[in-house]
């Protein structure tokens, strides 16, 4: 299933950066926060680069379609749990985001087993950008000023809406596949 191309290697690298992020955050020091911000930004950058390269080089793989979103979720979930444990993020925000991410992951895996593979949508990409910006803001800015709170609320809203969009899009694809002449 793993195809050793640069986009897939970047996805694996992103997964490997997750423990470094957690260790840096949980050190709970100014230097640890700087390191965590750098690691998180670097890992997030690999998400954009691997997607761009996969499309530009026509090297999109099933591994990439499945593991790229999973790597994103691991990165975000690890950061959220770490920030909640440090009391730098409200637990309800993390729970809403994590619940959405887990639900979409379960739906994605179920769809794949049914032969339906759905890549990331524009809405999902916007959600990912907002989550990255929000997590970076919480890591970098202590005390959560109003603009960080607004960013977090917008992120939660878009996260929920993109989850609903994914669910209804998947349902539509399954219905099309099951319809007579729909390929299912």
Across the structure, where does each feature detected by a protein language model lie?
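Membrane-embedded alpha-helical segments that form the functional core of polytopic membrane enzymes
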Residues: 17-63, 79-95, 148-160
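Membrane-interface helix caps of multi-pass small-molecule transporters
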Residues: 52-56, 110, 140
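Active-site His/Glu-centered metal-binding helix of metallohydrolases
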Residues: 16, 45-53, 70, 74, ...
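C-terminal membrane-associated helical module and adjoining short loops/tails
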Residues: 1-7, 12, 17-18, 36-44, ...
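Alpha-helical membrane-protein architecture signal
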Residues: 35-38, 63, 67, 103, ...
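Membrane-helix boundary/interface segments in integral membrane proteins
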Residues: 100-116
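Cytoplasmic-side transmembrane-helix entry/capping segments in multi-pass membrane proteins
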Residues: 67-71, 95-96, 121-127
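Short, conserved structural micro-motifs that define repeat-unit consensus positions
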Residues: 4-25, 72-80
